């Protein structure tokens, strides 16, 4: 007999190779694996071993063998009956399938969104054809794949006496909606640093204060190193941290709030002791109040001889900021940012407010937060400064930021050091995003990169569709409809006028408007032209801008168009009041609308006998037409409105002059034109309704 391998022997006797190897080892015969050759002597020994085992079968084994024989006989008989036997089997299978399809009708079904006819039939345990018949009886022509709305689903289910419950499914694509609404267990919440923004008028010492705090309180490990500017930084006071946003104060409120982000916990309002309350101070107060954050007043420049802190306190009481010493609840801290005096006291007050407000977050979850700054770097790609507001962000986390996505490749803290984790209220600069996000975008970390990518792409697509069919902000045209639907309980207004008296008169008159269920709230007033800052505040607060004898500048117009902010311009106070009141009562029906078609800057003036003053102009925007109405604007204030008398290019009369061309203009019955004036051309267009 020739030699045989282990696996061949195992196959021959229907035994596993492993069993053969084990048996050989028990017999003290060494084999390495299933490919080992077995000689005749070893094969004989194995045969003897297995023959002895086969000769002593148990009763159970005998019964099993007999059963197998009987089964095999039955099977062989069945194979002979080819025709009728197979038919019987098919009938048995069909009966079995019918039995499986008979599903008990449930007492209750749940669904989310919509269901197709097929899905509803499956849930109800009915045939789709039966559901289609019922729909037909209701006058609805439907196919098996047609979507049914909630009312139709409830109607069909009630016909079978089945209760319907709609599941509320959280759409992770819209993660902003549930970031703020997530209920955290009290035990999971830990104390977090306060996020502080410094605001105030130009040259009142905001930047100096930031530098003073940074130079005196940054961590010692930074000394001698290169500080990386990431738009935010942390300082440590009495073993507690405070996060400062090193961004233009108003941007921290407006741009971010316009995108639904609330990043600031405390506002430091810097007011110069020698200068008092100025226009931008008032603007800052209105921004902070609109955001609903506590205000600490830092009375700066106390080292100057003309410093008068009592005057500052007195002026701020007019804006409901009453010092604690006078029975109010606003903290006032006298400081000198340039000399570093009072800084420690200011920081202690921040900690005190933080302690009272109890700022907390849950660090044991995936991170959520807001973009502070973002830019494109040639070497690193998209870079974003993120403020973690809840949870902990880690290197390697898949992340969705606004409409962008990626994985956190690297994180750098405020002192330029690489870090692996960032907890609540910590600012970090990250790389790894596919595109540059926008300041104020919300972000969320996810467990799965595939999921993050899918959500990021869906959000980008959604944003594109929203941009195409963009719905405007609150406007007078749809105001009454929104009031009727209960969407509007309060109308936010921003009032700008040419003089303070007009501002006060306009504001007082608007506040007197009395329409049931709706009240007027004036969030900001000011003197002078309507600026971009006014438009951004209006966008963030969903407000309407009312201008009396003032005009928006070019940037304000552009921003108003992009942000869909409604600007209403008037020259008579009672008409402005009438328009707002009519809108609130649903009686607004203007027939014509003014459309500004161009602007020209007066570069030079010429006085000509019997003609008057000729304005040598340069068209800066749009076009000036012969039949358009014009108004003269000086320093943002309208000083005259009338009609064009002549419009010339060189010596020729022309119908219109386009942008970037020079022209000569005379205005009917008006000669007081000066260099630097802006001539604005407008036409009246019929409003389509």
Curated annotation (Swiss-Prot):
Residues 200-207 are annotated as: G1. Residues 71-84 have a biased composition (Basic residues). CDD domains: IF2_eIF5B (cd01887), IF2_mtIF2_II (cd03702), mtIF2_IVc (cd03692). Residues 336-338 are annotated as: G5. One of its GO terms (cellular component) is cytosol. SUPFAM superfamilies: Initiation factor IF2/eIF5b, domain 3, P-loop containing nucleoside triphosphate hydrolases, Translation proteins. Residues 191-360 form the tr-type G domain. Residues 300-303 are annotated as: G4. Coiled coil: none annotated. It is found in: Cytoplasm. The keyword Nucleotide-binding applies. Pfam families: EF-G_D2 (PF22042), GTP_EFTU (PF00009), IF-2 (PF11987), IF2_N (PF04760). Residues 225-229 are annotated as: G2. GO terms for molecular function: GTP binding; GTPase activity; translation initiation factor activity. Residues 246-249 are annotated as: G3. Its main location: cytoplasm. Residues 70-107 are annotated as: Disordered. Keywords: Cytoplasm, GTP-binding, Initiation factor, Nucleotide-binding, Protein biosynthesis. GTP binds at residues 200-207, 246-250, 300-303. Belongs to the TRAFAC class translation factor GTPase superfamily. Classic translation factor GTPase family. IF-2 subfamily. One of the essential components for the initiation of protein synthesis. Protects formylmethionyl-tRNA from spontaneous hydrolysis and promotes its binding to the 30S ribosomal subunits. Also involved in the hydrolysis of GTP during the formation of the 70S ribosomal complex. This is Translation initiation factor IF-2. It comes from Bacillus cytotoxicus (strain DSM 22905 / CIP 110041 / 391-98 / NVH 391-98). The lineage of its organism: Bacteria, Bacillati, Bacillota, Bacilli, Bacillales. The gene is infB.
């Amino acid at each position: 007999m020739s030699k045989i391998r282990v696996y061949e022997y195992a196959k021959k006797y229907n035994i596993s190779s492993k069993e053969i190897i084990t048996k050989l080892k028990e017999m003290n015969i060494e084999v390495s694996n299933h490919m080992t050759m077995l000689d005749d002597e070893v094969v004989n020994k194995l045969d003897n071993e297995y023959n002895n085992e086969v000769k002593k079968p148990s009763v159970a084994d005998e019964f099993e063998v007999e059963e197998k024989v009987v089964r095999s006989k039955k099977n062989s008989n069945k194979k002979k009956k080819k025709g009728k036997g197979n038919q019987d089997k098919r009938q048995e299978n069909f009966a079995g399938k019918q039995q499986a399809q008979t599903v008990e009708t449930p007492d209750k079904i749940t669904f989310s969104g919509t269901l197709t006819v097929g899905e509803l039939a499956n849930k109800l345990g009915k045939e789709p054809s039966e559901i289609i018949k019922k729909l037909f009886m209701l006058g609805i022509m439907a196919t098996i794949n047609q979507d049914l709305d909630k009312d139709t689903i409830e109607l069909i289910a009630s016909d079978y006496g089945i209760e319907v419950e709609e599941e509320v499914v959280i759409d992770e694509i819209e993660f902003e909606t549930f970031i703020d609404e997530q209920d955290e267990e009290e035990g999971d919440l830990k104390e977090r640093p306060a996020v502080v923004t410094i605001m105030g008028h130009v040259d009142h010492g905001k930047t100096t204060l930031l530098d003073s705090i940074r130079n005196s309180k940054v961590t010692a490990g930074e000394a001698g190193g290169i500080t990386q500017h990431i738009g935010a930084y942390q300082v440590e006071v009495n073993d507690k941290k405070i996060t400062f946003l090193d961004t233009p104060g108003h941007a921290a409120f407006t741009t971010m709030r316009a995108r639904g982000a609330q990043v600031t916990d405390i506002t430091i309002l810097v007011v110069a002791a020698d200068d008092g309350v100025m226009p931008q101070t008032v603007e800052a107060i209105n921004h902070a109040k609109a955001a609903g954050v506590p205000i600490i007043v830092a009375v700066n420049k106390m080292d100057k001889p003309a410093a008068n802190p009592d005057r500052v306190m007195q002026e701020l009481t007019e804006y409901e900021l009453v010092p604690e010493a006078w029975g109010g609840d606003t903290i006032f801290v006298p400081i000198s940012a340039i000399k570093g005096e009072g800084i420690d006291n200011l920081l202690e007050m921040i900690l005190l407010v933080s302690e009272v407000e109890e700022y907390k977050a849950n660090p044991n979850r995936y991170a959520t937060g807001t973009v502070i700054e973002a830019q494109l770097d040639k070497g690193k790609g998209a870079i974003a400064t993120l403020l973690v507001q809840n949870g902990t962000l880690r290197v390697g986390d898949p992340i969705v930021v606004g409409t962008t996505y990626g994985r956190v490749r690297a994180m750098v803290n405020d002192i330029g050091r690489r870090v692996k984790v960032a907890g609540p209220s910590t600012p970090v600069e990250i790389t790894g995003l596919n595109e540059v996000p926008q300041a104020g975008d919300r972000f969320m970390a996810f467990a799965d990169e595939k999921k993050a990518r899918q959500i990021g792409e869906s959000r980008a697509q959604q944003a594109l569709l929203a941009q195409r069919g963009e719905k405007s902000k609150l406007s007078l045209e749809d105001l009454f409809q929104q009031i009727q639907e209960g969407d509007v309980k309060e109308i936010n207004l921003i009032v700008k006028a040419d003089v303070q008296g007009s501002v006060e008169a306009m504001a007082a008159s608007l506040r007197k408007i009395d329409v049931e269920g709706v009240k007027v709230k004036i969030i900001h007033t000011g003197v002078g032209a309507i600026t971009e800052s006014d438009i951004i505040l209006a966008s963030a607060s969903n407000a309407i801008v009312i201008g009396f004898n003032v005009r928006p500048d070019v940037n304000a117009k552009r921003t108003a168009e992009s942000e869909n902010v409604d600007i209403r311009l008037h020259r008579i106070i009672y008409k402005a009041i009438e328009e707002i009141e009519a809108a609130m009562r649903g009686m607004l029906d203007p027939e014509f609308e003014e459309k500004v078609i161009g602007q020209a800057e007066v570069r030079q003036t010429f006085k000509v006998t019997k003609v008057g003053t000729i304005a040598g102009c340069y068209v800066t925007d749009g076009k000036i037409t012969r039949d358009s109405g014009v108004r003269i604007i000086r320093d943002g204030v309208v000083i005259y409105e009338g009609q064009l008398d002549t419009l010339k290019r060189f010596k020729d009369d022309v119908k219109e002059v386009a942008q970037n061309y020079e022209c000569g203009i005379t205005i009917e019955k008006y000669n007081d034109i000066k260099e630097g004036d802006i001539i604005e051309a407008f036409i009246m267009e019929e409003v389509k309704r």
